[in-house]
Swiss-Prot record:
Protein known as: Tryptophan 2,3-dioxygenase
Job of this protein: Heme-dependent dioxygenase that catalyzes the oxidative cleavage of the L-tryptophan (L-Trp) pyrrole ring and converts L-tryptophan to N-formyl-L-kynurenine. Catalyzes the oxidative cleavage of the indole moiety.
Pfam families xref list: Trp_dioxygenase
Gene Ontology biological process: L-tryptophan catabolic process to acetyl-CoA; L-tryptophan catabolic process to kynurenine
HAMAP family for the chain: T23O
Protein family membership: Belongs to the tryptophan 2,3-dioxygenase family.
Species this protein is from: Dictyostelium discoideum (Social amoeba)
C-alpha cells in the first residue's frame, strides 16, 4: 500500500517505520488487562453499577415539605440522566483531544476519532429526543413543585458548560446571564472546574492545528490554492457570460442576475484576500486560521480521494455536533416556553427570552465549517490533480 499520511508532510522511510509504529502503540488507548484471579471472583450486576446508591438519590423537594408532587420524580430523573450523558460526552471529547494533542496524529487513530465523534452525535440525538419525555409533564403539573427549586437553574449544569468550553466556545462570545459573567452563578468548586476547562486547549484549536498539517496544500510544485482560485475565476466569468447571452431573460432579470453574480464574486474575492481574512480573524468573526480554512476546502472538494475519506468524516461529524447542540437548545427553548411561558426562570433569568438568544450562530463552534459550503464548486469543474499528487493521495494494494 502506498500514499502519504494526511497530516504528515512526507512518507516514512523504512528506518522510520519502527518509531512510527511505536508512537502509534503508545497513542492507542488500550484497555487494561483483567487479572485472572479477580475475574474468578465475579462481579454482581447491582454492585458493579452501584444501583443501591444510584436509585436512592432522587430526593423530591415536594416530599420534604409534605406535599408530594408526582411529576417531580420525572423531572429529577430526566436531569440526572442528562448529567450522566454529559459525563460520557466529556469522556469522549477528552479522549479525542488526547489523541490529537500529540502530532502527527497516526492515520490508524483517525478511525478512533471518527468512532468517538459519532458516539457523541448519537448521545446528542438521544438528548434531543429525551425532551419529548419531559414534555409529557404539563404546565400545571410543573407548578406543583416549581417554586421549591428556587434559585437552582439548568444554567448551573457545570458539565454542559464544560462541554461547551472543551469544544471551543469562548467566554466573550457567551450571552450574559442576568448581566453577569457566567461564572457568577456557580459555587467556588464549579467555578474552578470551569476556569480549568477555559485554560485547556479546546477541540477546535486542535482541529485547526490538525488541518494546518495537511501536506497537500503545497506538494512537489502543486499549489492547491492557486489551482482552486483559477477554477473559481473561470466559473464566475462563465456565469456572467451565460446571463448576458440568455435571450430568454428580460433586461430586469438580467440586471438582477448580474447583481447576484457580482455579489458572489465579491464573496470569493474576500476569501482570496489573506490580509482581509486575518483582519476578520482578529475581530473574532471567523475562528479557523487561513491555512486551516484552505485545508478544509481542499478536503471537502476532494473528499473522494482515499487520503481524505476519514478527514472529511471528521469535519462532517464536527458540524453535526454543532447542529445537534443547536437543535437541543432550540427544543429546550420551545419546551420552556410551552411549560412556563414568559415567566421568570427559577434562577432569576428571563427564562424563554434568555434561552432564545442562545439559539443561533453565536454559539456555533465550527461555524466556519458550515460556511465552507459557500465556496464549493461542482465536481466537473474541479482542477485535475497532478499525477504525483494523486498517487500520494491514493491507496494501492498489490500482491507480490
Amino acid at each position: 500500500m502506498s500514499g502519504c499520511q494526511f497530516n504528515q508532510p512526507y512518507c516514512p522511510r523504512s528506518e522510520e517505520k519502527k518509531s512510527i509504529a511505536e508512537s502509534i502503540e503508545k497513542a492507542t488507548l488500550m484497555e487494561p488487562s483483567i487479572d485472572a484471579q479477580s475475574a474468578q471472583k465475579g462481579v454482581y450486576y447491582g454492585s458493579y453499577l452501584k444501583l443501591d446508591e444510584l436509585l436512592n438519590i432522587q430526593e423530591c423537594e415536594s416530599v420534604k415539605v409534605g406535599a408530594p408532587a408526582h411529576e417531580e420524580m420525572l423531572f429529577i430523573i430526566i436531569h440526572q440522566t442528562y448529567e450522566l450523558w454529559f459525563k460520557q460526552m466529556i469522556h469522549e471529547i477528552d479522549s479525542i483531544r488526547s489523541i490529537m494533542s500529540t502530532p502527527p496524529t497516526p492515520e490508524r487513530l483517525n478511525g478512533v476519532i471518527v468512532n468517538r465523534l459519532g458516539r457523541i452525535t448519537e448521545i446528542q440525538k438521544l438528548l434531543v429526543d429525551q425532551i419529548s419525555i419531559l414534555e409529557t409533564m404539563t404546565s400545571v403539573d410543573f407548578l406543583e413543585f416549581r417554586n421549591l427549586l428556587v434559585p437552582a437553574s439548568g444554567f448551573q449544569s457545570v458539565q454542559f458548560r464544560m462541554i461547551e468550553n472543551k469544544l471551543g466556545i469562548l467566554p466573550n462570545t457567551r450571552v450574559q446571564y442576568q448581566q453577569h459573567h457566567y461564572h457568577s452563578f456557580f459555587n467556588e468548586k464549579d467555578r474552578k472546574a470551569l476556569q480549568a476547562t477555559e485554560n485547556e486547549v479546546s477541540l477546535l484549536q486542535l482541529v485547526i492545528q490538525w488541518l494546518e498539517r495537511n501536506p497537500f496544500l503545497y506538494y512537489k510544485g502543486y499549489d492547491f490554492w492557486s489551482s482552486y482560485k483559477s477554477a473559481v475565476d473561470q466559473i464566475l466569468e462563465n456565469d456572467l457570460q451565460r446571463i448576458q447571452a440568455n435571450n430568454d431573460l428580460s433586461q430586469d432579470m438580467k440586471d438582477q442576475s448580474t447583481k447576484e453574480a457580482k455579489k458572489n464574486m465579491e464573496s470569493f474575492s474576500t476569501l482570496f484576500d489573506e490580509v482581509a481574512y486575518n483582519e476578520r480573524l482578529e475581530k473574532g468573526e471567523v475562528r479557523l486560521s487561513y491555512k486551516a480554512l484552505q485545508s478544509a476546502i481542499l478536503i471537502y472538494l476532494y473528499k473522494d480521494e482515499p487520503i481524505f475519506h476519514t478527514p472529511f468524516l471528521i469535519l462532517n461529524l464536527l458540524t453535526e455536533i454543532d447542529e445537534l447542540l443547536t437543535m437541543w437548545r432550540f427544543r429546550h427553548t420551545m419546551m420552556v416556553q410551552r411549560i412556563i411561558g414568559a415567566k421568570i426562570g427559577t434562577g432569576g433569568s428571563s427564562g424563554y427570552h434568555y434561552l432564545r438568544t442562545t439559539v443561533g450562530d453565536r454559539y456555533k463552534i465550527f461555524l466556519d465549517l458550515f460556511n465552507i459550503s459557500s465556496y464549493l464548486i461542482p465536481k466537473n469543474t474541479l482542477p485535475q490533480l497532478p499525477k504525483v499528487v494523486k498517487e500520494q493521495m491514493d491507496f494501492a494494494w498489490s500482491i507480490l
